[in-house]
């Protein structure tokens, strides 16, 4: 299902910052595809290169790290509107994996075109930096939950976050 950025239902959500028609057009121009994946599909492989950045259009996913003994630690959950794969695009390889928790739809943005767009529209680059900082604050909260909260407090914090 191909969706134009101009018709994206996520833009109507009050949680998202409005962007100019010019910025929206530029994003729509570089968007390459709309990918549909089933629950359990690997979106990003830990240690792998990823030439794309995605926006989660629908469904849920989670970011995780696999421990040496095979256990997985969920780092956080990704919901519609979240940027997926930014870390993997910034470094040579992803430091974590991302898996679809439910069936998902992703808008695919080629990394090189995104970087070029940031040079043309620094306001968008700032917005993405803000998203990265916001994500970091969630990770800080998750670390606090794991290290210092009781099981009941961890459950409550997760519900509030979602």
Each language-model region and where it sits:
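Cyclic nucleotide-binding regulatory module and flanking cytosolic helices
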Residues: 1-39, 83-84, 89-90, 120
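Cyclic nucleotide-binding regulatory domains
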Residues: 15, 41-103
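Residue-level recognition of specific faces of alpha-helices
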Residues: 26, 52, 74-77, 97, ...
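A generic structural signal for short hydrophobic patches within well-formed alpha-helices
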Residues: 83, 114-115
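Conserved active-site beta-strand element of glycosyltransferases/polysaccharide synthases
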Residues: 107
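Polybasic "coupling" helices that flank or enter modular domains
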Residues: 119-162
